C-alpha cells in the first residue's frame, strides 16, 4: 500500500543531478525509480519542457541539489511553441514534494493558453503533499499553483503544506482579443487541514490565495502584494462553494496585504461578495484575525452571504489611503457599495447577509442594502475615450470597449452595441441577431480605417454609422449623446441622435 511504502523505505535519490534534458528525462527517473525517488536538478540548470512532469508514486520529490532558495534554483520552463500549460502534476500520490525549484509557465513567450491548467497541479485523494521554497510564475493558464480537491468529501485531499514559496506574477488583467479572461490566481487551495504559511505572492490578478472551502486549513503569515501594472480582484478569497460551502475551522491569520495598482478586495468572505451572487450562504465557523491591509485596497474586508459563525477581529487597515476617491472609482458598483466607498469604510458587511453568530471588530460598517459583487471598483476612470481608425476592433462579449466614470459601452453577444449608465441602457444600436454570435463569436465591432463604425457577423456587415470616407475618430463619453464620430477637422459628423 502507498502509506506503507512511504513509511518503511527511505528516499532514493537518482544518481547525480540533471543539468539538461526535458520532461522525458525526469519522467523516466520517476517511472523507473518508483516510490520515494528523489529527482534533483543541478543549480542554475534550465530545463525546457513540451509536456508535463508527472509524479508516479508516493513519496517522490523533485528539487534542486543543495536546496538553494534564491536565483540558483533550477528553472523548469515551458518551451515556445509547446502545447504544455501545467509543468508538474501529482494527483493522488501521498507525501510527494516539490522543493527549491523555479517554474516558469512562460506566458509571454509561449502565449496564453485558453483552458490551460495551473503551473503546479497536485492534490486529489492524497495526504501530506509539500510545496516549499518554490518560485512559480507566468502561468499560461488560470493559476500559479493548484492543490485540487478529490471530488469526494468522504476521501478529501488533506494535510498539504504550502510553505515559503515566492509566487508571481500570475496573469494579467482584462481580456484578450477573443474575449478570454487573462487573470490568474497565486495559490488555489482545495485541500482540507492544510497549512499555507510564509508565502510571498506578488502580482496575482484573480485571487492571491483562493480558499475553495478547505475546512480545517490555516492561512498564516503570508504576504500578498498586487501588481503595479495590473488590477487584482482579491488578495484572499473565501467565496467558493466546495465542500458543501463549508469553511469550518478555517483560520486566516497574520497575513500582510498591500495594494499597489489596486486590489478590489483584501479578504472577501461569503457567497455574495464576488461576482457569483449565489442563492445559498457559505458556512463557518471561521476566524479572520491579525491581518494587516495597506495601500490601494478598495475594500480591505467584505462580508456577505455567510452562516454558522464568523470571528473577524484585530485586523488593521489604517494604512489604506483616504479618501478612496483619490485613487479608486466605485461608479460601476451597486448603490450600497458606492455608499460604503464614499464613507471610506474599510470593513463592511450587510447584516441580513450574515446569519447565526458573529464577532466583528467595532469598526465594521453596516451597509444600507445588499452588497453584491465587489469586483466593481477600479482605478479612477476617465470621462471619455477616443479611438482612431482601426484602433477599436473587438469581438462580442469581450468586456466594455469604453469603461468610463459611471458609464460603460459594450458590444453584446447578440451583436447589439449598448451604452449603460448605472447598469441601465441609455442607448443601443438596435441591431441584434436572434441566433446570437455563436461560440466562438463570429461578431466584431470595428471602427475602420475609413472612419466607419461597423458591426460584422461572419465577415458580413450588419450595422454601421454610415461615416465611411468621412470619419477620423470615434469618442465615447459619459453623458449624452454618448458616442460621437468626428472628421479630420474635429467636426461632429455623427452621434447617437443624429447624422450630418
Show the residue positions of the predicted features.
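Beta-rich ligand-binding surfaces for carbohydrates and other polyanions
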Residues: 380-500
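Short glycine/acidic-rich loop motifs that flank beta-strands on beta-rich extracellular proteins
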Residues: 49-52, 71-73, 80-87, 107-118, ...
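Acidic, glycine- and Ser/Thr-rich low-complexity intrinsically disordered tracts
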Residues: 281, 305-380
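Acidic Gly/Asp/Thr-rich repetitive segments characteristic of extracellular carbohydrate-active
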Residues: 15-42
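Right-handed parallel beta-helix
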Residues: 59-65, 94-107, 126-139, 146, ...
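Extracellular beta-strand-rich solenoid/capping regions of secreted or surface-exposed proteins
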Residues: 27, 31-34, 46-63, 70-99, ...
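Fungal secretory targeting signals
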Residues: 1-15
Amino acid at each position: 500500500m502507498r502509506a506503507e511504502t512511504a513509511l518503511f523505505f527511505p528516499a532514493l535519490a537518482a544518481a547525480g543531478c540533471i543539468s539538461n534534458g526535458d520532461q522525458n528525462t525526469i519522467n523516466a527517473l520517476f517511472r523507473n525509480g518508483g516510490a520515494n525517488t528523489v529527482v534533483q536538478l543541478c543549480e542554475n540548470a534550465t530545463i525546457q519542457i513540451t509536456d508535463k512532469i508527472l509524479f508516479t508514486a508516493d513519496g517522490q520529490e523533485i528539487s534542486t541539489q543543495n536546496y538553494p532558495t534564491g536565483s540558483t534554483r533550477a528553472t523548469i520552463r515551458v518551451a515556445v511553441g509547446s502545447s504544455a500549460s501545467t509543468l508538474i502534476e501529482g494527483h493522488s500520490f501521498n507525501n510527494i514534494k516539490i522543493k527549491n525549484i523555479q517554474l516558469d509557465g512562460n506566458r509571454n513567450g509561449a502565449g496564453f493558453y485558453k483552458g490551460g491548467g495551473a503551473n503546479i497541479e497536485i492534490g486529489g485523494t492524497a495526504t501530506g503533499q509539500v510545496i516549499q521554497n518554490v518560485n512559480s510564475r507566468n502561468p499560461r493558464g488560470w493559476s500559479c499553483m493548484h492543490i485540487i480537491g478529490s471530488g469526494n468529501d468522504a476521501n478529501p485531499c488533506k494535510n498539504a503544506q504550502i510553505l515559503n514559496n515566492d509566487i508571481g506574477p500570475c496573469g494579467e488583467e482584462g481580456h484578450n482579443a477573443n474575449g478570454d479572461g487573462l487573470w490568474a490566481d497565486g495559490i488555489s487551495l482545495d485541500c482540507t487541514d492544510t497549512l499555507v504559511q510564509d508565502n510571498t505572492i506578488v502580482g496575482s490578478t484573480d485571487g492571491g490565495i483562493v480558499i475553495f472551502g478547505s475546512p480545517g486549513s490555516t492561512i498564516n503569515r503570508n504576504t500578498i502584494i498586487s501588481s503595479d501594472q495590473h488590477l487584482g480582484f482579491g488578495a484572499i478569497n473565501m467565496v467558493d462553494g466546495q465542500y458543501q460551502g463549508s469553511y469550518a475551522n478555517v483560520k486566516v491569520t497574520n497575513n500582510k496585504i498591500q495594494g499597489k495598482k489596486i486590489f478590489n478586495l483584501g479578504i472577501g468572505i461569503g457567497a455574495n461578495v464576488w461576482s457569483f451572487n449565489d442563492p445559498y450562504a457559505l458556512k463557518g465557523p471561521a476566524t479572520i484575525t491579525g491581518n494587516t491591509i495597506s495601500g490601494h485596497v478598495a475594500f480591505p474586508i467584505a462580508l456577505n452571504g455567510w452562516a454558522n459563525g464568523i470571528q473577524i477581529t484585530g485586523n488593521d487597515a489604517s494604512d489604506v489611503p483616504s479618501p478612496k476617491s483619490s485613487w479608486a472609482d466605485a461608479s460601476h458598483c451597486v448603490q450600497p457599495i458606492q455608499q460604503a466607498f464614499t464613507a471610506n469604510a474599510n470593513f463592511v458587511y450587510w447584516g441580513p447577509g450574515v446569519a447565526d453568530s458573529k464577532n466583528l471588530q467595532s469598526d465594521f460598517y453596516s451597509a444600507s442594502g445588499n452588497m453584491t459583487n465587489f469586483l466593481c471598483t477600479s482605478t479612477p476612470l476617465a470621462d471619455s475615450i477616443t479611438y482612431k481608425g482601426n484602433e477599436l476592433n473587438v469581438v462580442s462579449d469581450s468586456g466594455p470597449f469604453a469603461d468610463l466614470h459611471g458609464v460603460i459601452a459594450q458590444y453584446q453577444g447578440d451583436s447589439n452595441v449598448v451604452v449603460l449608465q448605472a447598469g441601465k441602457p441609455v442607448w443601443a444600436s438596435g441591431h441584434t441577431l436572434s441566433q446570437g454570435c455563436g461560440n466562438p463569436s463570429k461578431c466584431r465591432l470595428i471602427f475602420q480605417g475609413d472612419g466607419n463604425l461597423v458591426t460584422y457577423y461572419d465577415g458580413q456587415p450588419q450595422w454601421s454609422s454610415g461615416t465611411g470616407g468621412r470619419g477620423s475618430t470615434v469618442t465615447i463619453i459619459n453623458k449624452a449623446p454618448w458616442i460621437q464620430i468626428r472628421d479630420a477637422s474635429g467636426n461632429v459628423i455623427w452621434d447617437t441622435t443624429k447624422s450630418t
